Amino acid sequence: MKLQTILKRLQKLHPKEIDLSLGRVFRLCKKLGNPQNNLDCISVVGTNGKYSTIQVMKSILDESNINYNIYTSPHLKKINERFVYNNKEINDEDLAKLLNKIEKINNGDEITFFEILTVAFFYGAKNFNKNINLIEAGLFHRFDATNILEKNLVTI
């Protein structure tokens, strides 16, 4: 299964109409057992400096020997950059498996690319649920797919 093939299929799920609600994200997370509810997260929001703020926090966690997962967007070179689990960027094979599973559970329902990637991150992070999760919000934090966290430790 090729990662690029899966990504193309996921992009075709984008809704035809704009809907800024979080309904699609909640629906898919519910089908997956709400993995986001068992994660300790730090959300980074705002217009500028989110990625650099996450990189500073990552350095602090590295120096403190604290394990972390990171979700950012957009990516610069490869989509894998968005998914860091247990201090390491996910490889192509594992990302393809993760996205394939999420795609099957979604069952063709409309969902934005960012939303399905966010849900996939939460689902993958449940395997490392003792880690601190650094989450970069997308465009609109209030209606952002990352804004469904029950155990948000802090928002920066």
Positions of predicted regions on the chain:
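A conserved segment at the C-terminal end of the G1
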Residues: 40-44, 52-69
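ATP-dependent carboxylate-amine ligase catalytic core
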Residues: 16, 22, 26-37, 63-150
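Charged, amphipathic alpha-helical linker segments immediately N-terminal to NTP-binding catalytic cores
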Residues: 1-16
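Non-catalytic interaction surface on structured domains
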Residues: 8-12, 30-40, 57
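Conserved beta-strand/loop subsegment of P-loop NTPase cores
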Residues: 153-156
